Amino acid sequence: MITLRKLPIALAVAAGVLSTQAMAVDFHGYARSGIGWTASGGEQQCFQTTGAQSKYRLGNECETYAELKLGQELWKEGDKSFYLDTNVAYSVSQRDDWESTDPAFREANVQGKNLIESLPGSTIWAGKRFYQRHDVHMIDFYYWDISGPGAGLETIDLGFGKLSVAATRNSESGGSSAWIDNQRENAKYTINNVYDVRLAGLETNPGGSLELGVDYGRADTQEGYSLAPNASKDGVMLTAEHTQSLMGGFNKFVVQYATDSMTSYNTGHSQGTSVNNNGHLLRVIDHGAINLAEKWDMMYVALYQDIDLDNNNGNTWYSVGVRPMYKWTPIMSTLLEAGYDNVKSQHTGERNGQYKLTLAQQWQAGDSIWSRPAIRVFATYANWDEKWGYSDTTGVAQDGTIGTNSRGKNNEVTFGAQFEAWW
């Protein structure tokens, strides 16, 4: 029993322990928000080529978005540890003061490091997780991303490289059916499992390394349920990525090939219940960020992606862009982003094209093109000519703007201010 005399001491010790634990909580995240206008009137418009899977993002983001991550090392003994990581994401239209939205629970996982004596340096994990994602920042395009609920063992040291294995899951609405009480009933959802194997850190040349990956995705129906007869069911995605240190930064060269269920989402997620994604995908990307001179940095990307589908509803996407940055002082810079997208329809043979230019004056926490937080004012000009779009009723590509999501031919100017931060 704690006497009254000892109570203040006990409370002080407890407060100290709780304070230490509170200080150990890691707070990380990403956020962006701002305000913008369109020269012809109204709120800021954003510009993305019909058929392209992303857009050049500088001065071309029309939403408030945030990811708030809380994590803590829950236990540590020597080099062994358990770490809890969570992430809640929000996205709203940034039109009003009060904008309510349901948050997306993106991550909740525990990672155990060095728990397997025979595999020093490895990490075992389970839960929802952003898993080893690969992206092109300037177009916000995640080309290798199997994130979701899952489990795995990563960074197994083989001597010549690091091996990682994982299984993750996502679902499709409906997708399968069964005879129940003498009638056909559709499932509310059908899950897709992805099995991922990666070998990273393969030294190829001075300053260069190679990462190889295989992803197999398959629809997994409930007992008694079956997919449509012509559903893609499963597919494979192969990835090879070479990373080279270059001019104070890096260059990444990526080649990916995918089949059937792995073609429609084409970042690593599977859609095996679909009847419209049998075919194959080939993607080649070269992107990076370099230091050109004492006061100059630059991001760049060149992308080719061909989705050849059996139903003739695929497309071929070309994209090229640069974002040079001139640093007036260690905390103030000017950026120019120039990007061009062109998408050819497999069905119609027609093309959609757009070029987009953004000039931004920026104040950032440091003199790197990656320095954040940043506050920027910007002006954007976009010019597009679209010959085809996807039908509003069937989803099949067709010529013209009537009854499709084609934007036709036009141009526009927008301007505004935005902050962006990661921490």
Curated annotation (Swiss-Prot):
Residues 1-24 form the signal peptide. Belongs to the porin LamB (TC 1.B.3) family. The keyword Transport applies. It comes from the Bacteria. GO terms for cellular component: cell outer membrane; pore complex. Homotrimer formed of three 18-stranded antiparallel beta-barrels, containing three independent channels. It is found in: Cell outer membrane. It is a multi-pass membrane protein. The record marks 30, 65, 98, 250, 370, 422 as: Greasy slide, important in sugar transport. Involved in the transport of maltose and maltodextrins. This is Maltoporin 1. The record marks 142 as: Important in sugar transport. Keywords: Cell outer membrane, Ion transport, Membrane, Porin, Signal, Sugar transport, Transmembrane, Transmembrane beta strand, Transport. PANTHER family: CRYPTIC OUTER MEMBRANE PORIN BGLH-RELATED (PTHR38762:SF1). GO terms for molecular function: carbohydrate transmembrane transporter activity; maltodextrin transmembrane transporter activity; maltose transporting porin activity; porin activity. It catalyses: beta-maltose(in) = beta-maltose(out). GO terms for biological process: monoatomic ion transport; polysaccharide transport. The keyword Transport applies. Gene3D superfamilies: Porin, LamB type (2.40.170.10). InterPro entries: G_neg_Bact_CarbUptk_Porin, Maltoporin, Porin_LamB, Porin_LamB_sf. NCBIfam families: PRK09360.1. Induction: By maltose.
